[in-house]
Amino acid sequence: MVAVSAAMTQGVGLKGFAEKYPERFFDVGIAASHAVTFCAGLAAGGFKPFFAVYSTFMQRAYDQILHDVAVQKLNVTMLIDHAGFVGEDGQTHQGLFDIAALLPVPGMTLLAPADDVELKQMLAFAYLYGEPLAIRYPAKICRSFGAEFRFGVWRRMNEISSDIALLAVGGRCLDAALDAAEILASQSIATEVYNCSTLKPFDEDCLKALESKRLVITLEEGVKKGGFGEAVAARLRKPVCIGLGVDDKFVRHATVEQQLEENGLTAGNIAGIVKSNLF
């Protein structure tokens, strides 16, 4: 196993690894595109490379992800840090396009942990996985949910049975979904909440079960066009499917809390949408 950075050793949390295993760490400089090609070469040579990169900088390497990794079906794992809202890092550093960019890539597996426990389990899974894989996570992990990672499974996070389902991507969306379910429960409205930690491939069994629902709402810290919500809606025929995320706009400089509120990813807004579609 080797780790690769593109001049972001400290930012992506690889400083300790670099100091402990200098012979297994490579910083290629401000060259994200080259970093992906470099990882492809390492994988072709029998190594297991992990490339840690901010979501916004991953965009620079899309061509290399497609042609050097995905086409070749190489054993490269991309750790997409700072995915989702990054608050006051600025407008250009929001990590909002990686889901829409990676979902259509043939052979690419895409994961999104809800908390640090699930992230660690995904890293262990990635080490044994033999195909192109990306794991997206925010700059700061949300509270712990005790999430247990099961590849390809959208895990239900409450014991409630309902014809309303909230599908959450990532910890902050899951947090909002669970809080929304509590608000609705206080008004005698039952709501199922799912942790969709495997974005690709889809949980086909869960999709079949969702066909019987009345209302499905997806939540993601990313653009709605081409995102997880649109992909889910394309697969469901019967239920009303509403996708929450970022509309066709660039997100303004603000705190993460403000960005979540301005893009509808709060418990109160989610609960309001559920009620407005039931009555």
Feature locations, PLM:
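Glycine-rich, histidine-containing beta strand-loop boundary motifs that form or position
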Residues: 53, 80-82, 114
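Arginine/glycine-rich "motif VI" loop of SF2 helicases in the C-terminal RecA-like domain
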Residues: 44, 70-71
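Conserved glycine-bearing catalytic or ligand-binding loops at nucleotide- and phosphate-handling centers
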Residues: 112-127
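Extended, hydrophobic alpha-helical segments in both membrane/secreted and soluble proteins
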Residues: 13, 25, 32-52, 61-64, ...
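Short catalytic-loop micro-motif centered on adjacent basic/acidic residues
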Residues: 2-4, 25-27, 50-53, 109-112, ...
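Thiamine diphosphate
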Residues: 1-19, 33-37, 58-59, 71-94, ...
